[in-house]
Amino acid sequence: MPLYPIKLYVKHLPTLLCIGISLLLNIFTWIWLLIEIRPQTEPVFLHYNILFGVDFVGEWWQALYLPISGLAIIVVNAAMGWLLFSRDKFLAQILNGISLFCQLFLLFAAALLVFLNV
């Protein structure tokens, strides 16, 4: 089965909204983490557990794993959505919606990281 034209896939309104908002949230997460968690020699808190408190510390750049994983989720889901769009548009929209949902949770996790380290 031939691939759906990528220009038409990106111009589809639900796809455009989900991918666009996901990318904006990811860019905001990058900027926020880079502004708030600056390069430093002392370790930063990377994980907080309600039972044990801070249980994972590391280098400042390890906090950037959040937006990196978010970008990977966007790229993989958008590519899979494009491949599936000609067969099942609903499934492609679900994949892009999941990307948006993941970005919201990653932004929340970034907020916790920032407030834990500031």
Name each region found by the language model.
Residues 1-11:
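Short, Lys/Arg-rich, polar N-terminal cytosolic tail immediately upstream
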Residues 9-24, 93-98:
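Alpha-helical transmembrane segments and their helix-start/interface "positive-inside/aromatic belt" motifs
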